[in-house]
Amino acid sequence: MNLFVYIAQNPTLTKWFFCCVCTILTMPFFKKPYRKRGISRTPYEWLTYADKCVIELSKSELKPNEEKELPKDIKEDCKTVEEKEKVVPRKPLQSEGINEDDSQKNGELIVLHGINHQAAMLTACGLFMVTSSNTNKWKIAFASFLLGMFFTQFGFQKSERSINAEKLESIEKPENDN
């Protein structure tokens, strides 16, 4: 109990205590989006992929020395191993979220993609601490804290609707060959 009295009497400790409490309380709201690189998948996608592989292997019942037969049209086209790999690429499973490869192809850079909530809260708390040097201006300090939290969460990211709308516009635009 004496610790809380000491914190309440010291304005600097009160600010730091308030920032720590806000960081802990807002933890569920700052979720790190799952990042896709190459063929990486979410744990659920790995489980479904493994289940499909096990089912496929159990159906085919191949012995270790046997090769799986390719469909006829692929057999005729492929002459070497490299051509087989070009003709039959493994398709990754679909996952929710933003694909980094798509954003890099379109030249868009999402600034806060993958930022964790501690870095966002550090920015917000720093803004709060700088603006609240005078404790009489607590309303401005609290508003700046909330604005800092809001912009670290939503300020630099594009919504899925705007990204999908841009993709539709780029598909619908006819290209002139003149």
From Swiss-Prot:
GO terms for cellular component: endoplasmic reticulum; endoplasmic reticulum membrane. Keywords: Endoplasmic reticulum, Membrane, Signal-anchor, Transmembrane, Transmembrane helix. It is found in: Endoplasmic reticulum membrane. The keyword Aminoacyl-tRNA synthetase does not apply. The gene is mug95. This is Meiotically up-regulated gene 95 protein. The chain crosses the membrane at residues 13-30. Residues 1-12 are cytoplasmic. It comes from Schizosaccharomyces pombe (strain 972 / ATCC 24843) (Fission yeast). The keyword S-adenosyl-L-methionine does not apply. Residues 31-178 are lumenal. Signal peptide: none annotated. It is a single-pass type II membrane protein. Its main location: endoplasmic reticulum. Has a role in meiosis.
